[in-house]
Amino acid sequence: MAQARLAAVYAALLSLFLVPAAKSQQPEQARQREHFANADVQYDFVGNSRGDKLRTFVTKPKNAAGKIPVIFFVGWLSCDSVEYATESDGFGALIRRLIDQSGYATIRMDKPGVGESQGTPCNKADYQGELEGYRAAFDSLKKYDFIDPQKIFVVGLSNGGGVGPLVSGSQHVAGFIAASSWGRTWYEHMLENERVRLTTAGKSPAEVNDAVKAFTQFYNLYLIQRQKPGAILRQHPEWKSLWYDSPDGQYGRPASFYQQLQALNLGQAWQQVDVPVLVIHGSADTIMSRADSFAIAEIVNQAHPGRARYVEIPGMDHLFTVNMQFHSDLVPLILDWMKEALNTPR
């Protein structure tokens, strides 16, 4: 029974964070707009070289005076909107509470094909087009006269936490937060992810090891040799029982998306970061492992000792929930760290 419950929880998490959910597919007339007690929302668009028109959400505190800090959110992997009319999940709870409680401006972007973003359908959009959009959104900060360009925080959630430095590039950032995230290669991440998935599904240790051996070859062909899963399975029909997703991609995104993630060198990106970094991991996260998250802090501190802080929260899952409730202590943890980072000498 315990194994069955674990498997159900794992499947639920995958459905929430790695595949498109109903929230992203609402028709425009049914969309609920956000409202905040302490902030107003402005709507805009940015573009990328693919011709996509990407919706941005900019919030400004109602009583803001002069230039203020800003939180730039980098979103997750799935085709879910970053627009939250309610605290419908842990990511939404964190976003909404930071907007209402920080006193900072914020900016978010919906990736191609999500929400009101136009152009390439999300299930066809690769990672490079998405990254271009995030970079355009980051550049758009310059147009808002109430934002202090010396006080920009990049907050990456799930997949977005690992790629934060790629979004800002050489532009000034006051600090990075990587929550429920990754700092290794996507190949390493997926092999560990498959082991966890199979174990929580109740497979025996022998079955898990045999499957992981096959997955090492499968993911080499898929991520590194850049073949599609369907083509691989035609070459290796003995692996058909292992594969649980599309012949053209995975978790609702095309194969090219993950092949481009694998091509990234996050070690190089993070070792160049010489500003405060906060890495947050929940001990109950079955999507991004401790090794995935800790890698970021380890890389930064090896290059710049003391710059990164790693915080592991007992019992917290990928959704920032403990016992199915949002971990409310996460908000003051982040806000206190931001205040400290603003007072840290460069």
Segments (PLM) and residue ranges:
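N-terminal cap/lid segment of alpha/beta-hydrolase-fold proteins
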Residues: E28-G66
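Short, surface-exposed "cap/lid" segments of acyl-processing enzymes
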Residues: N63-L98
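Conserved alpha/beta-hydrolase
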Residues: L94-E116
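Alpha/beta-hydrolase active-site loop
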Residues: K124-Y144
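Accessory cap/linker subdomain of secreted extracellular hydrolases
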Residues: A179-Q272
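Short beta-strand/loop motif that positions the catalytic acidic residue
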Residues: V273, V279-H281, D285
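Short alpha-helix in the alpha/beta-hydrolase fold that links the catalytic acid
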Residues: V275, S289-I299
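Catalytic active-site module of serine/aspartate enzymes centered on a nucleophile-bearing elbow/loop
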Residues: M316-R346
